[in-house]
């Protein structure tokens, strides 16, 4: 109960701070999405601190998360610089701290690298395709022109594509654990991934419900139409990737079970 009160109080403070700084001119669903993400990070940090273990946690997912947050943060300096930037900076700081603990902290010995995606495969199959796609299909905003404009547009697009697949290594790792045991415990790692799922649902709703989405998808120029279509696909892919896990997580809660059983588990 105390932890729930602390989280609730933290979210209230976050909401009040954003409202005060930006005078109420912000996307409520986006703030709720970032709040859910921060709650997930709080659960994760609590796990690392109290359990002194990062067992079942994917370092690749944390690195990809830090990567897309950093790219989006750098690009937003030129294009937004609003509450999005503030909330992304908070998420990046928390993610960076988790990575530091998993790599160099005392809990690094509990990291199961054998079940995680290798750094080489992460770069080859996840990062590079996002970079190439970001260069080829990006918003083409003209606020910043020349080489810097091309780079910032590519960074922004790359962050969108990378965000869509960042959680994939974590889900694969959890599947590997579930296949070995026949189930996965509904523990802190599961709570963290479920919070990401809630954040993703809110983020997708925020994106789709914005009035400018129709102009993205049905823009006047062919390149802008393409960017709008790829952005929408990225949002849907990321939501669908997490939907399967969230379904089985909610099912375990409804059934009163502490175990999450996937459809492929026995």
Residue ranges and their predicted role:
Residues 40-162, 173-179, 230-255:
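Hydrophobic, ordered structural segments
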Residues 9-22, 69-75, 171:
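Membrane-embedded alpha-helical segments in integral membrane proteins
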Residues 1-12, 22, 29-32, 123:
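Membrane-interface recognition of transmembrane alpha-helix starts
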Residues 7-10, 34-38, 63-66, 163-164:
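Helix-boundary capping/turn motifs
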Residues 1, 15-23, 76-79, 144-152, ...:
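Juxtamembrane membrane-interface segments at transmembrane-helix boundaries in membrane proteins
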Residues 165-169, 173-266:
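C-terminal transmembrane module of eukaryotic multi-pass membrane proteins
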Residues 37-40, 169:
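Coil-to-helix interface segments in alpha-helical RNA-associated scaffolds
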């Amino acid at each position: 109960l105390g932890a729930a009160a602390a989280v609730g109080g933290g979210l209230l403070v976050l909401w009040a701070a954003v409202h005060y700084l930006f005078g109420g001119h912000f996307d409520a669903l986006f703030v709720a999405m970032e709040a859910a993400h921060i709650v997930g990070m709080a659960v994760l940090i609590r796990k690392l601190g109290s359990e002194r273990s990062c067992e079942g946690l994917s370092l690749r997912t944390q690195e990809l998360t830090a990567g897309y947050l950093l790219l989006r943060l750098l690009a937003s300096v030129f294009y937004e610089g609003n509450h999005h930037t503030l909330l992304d900076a908070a998420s990046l700081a928390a993610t960076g701290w988790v990575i530091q603990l998993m790599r160099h902290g005392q809990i690094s010995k509990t990291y199961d690298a054998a079940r995680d995606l290798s750094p080489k495969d992460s770069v080859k199959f996840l990062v590079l395709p996002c970079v190439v796609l970001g260069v080829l299909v990006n918003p083409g905003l003209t606020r910043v022109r020349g080489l810097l404009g091309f780079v910032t547009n590519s960074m922004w697009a790359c962050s969108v594509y990378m965000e869509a697949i960042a959680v994939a290594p974590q889900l694969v790792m959890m599947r590997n654990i579930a296949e070995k045991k026949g189930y996965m415990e509904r523990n802190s790692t599961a709570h963290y991934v479920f919070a990401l799922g809630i954040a993703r649902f809110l983020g997708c709703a925020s994106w789709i419900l914005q009035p400018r989405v129709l102009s993205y998808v049905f823009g006047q120029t062919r390149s802008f139409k393409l960017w709008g279509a790829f952005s929408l696909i990225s949002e849907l892919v990321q939501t669908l990737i997490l939907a399967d896990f969230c379904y089985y997580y909610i099912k375990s809660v409804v059934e009163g079970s502490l175990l999450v059983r996937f459809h492929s588990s026995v």
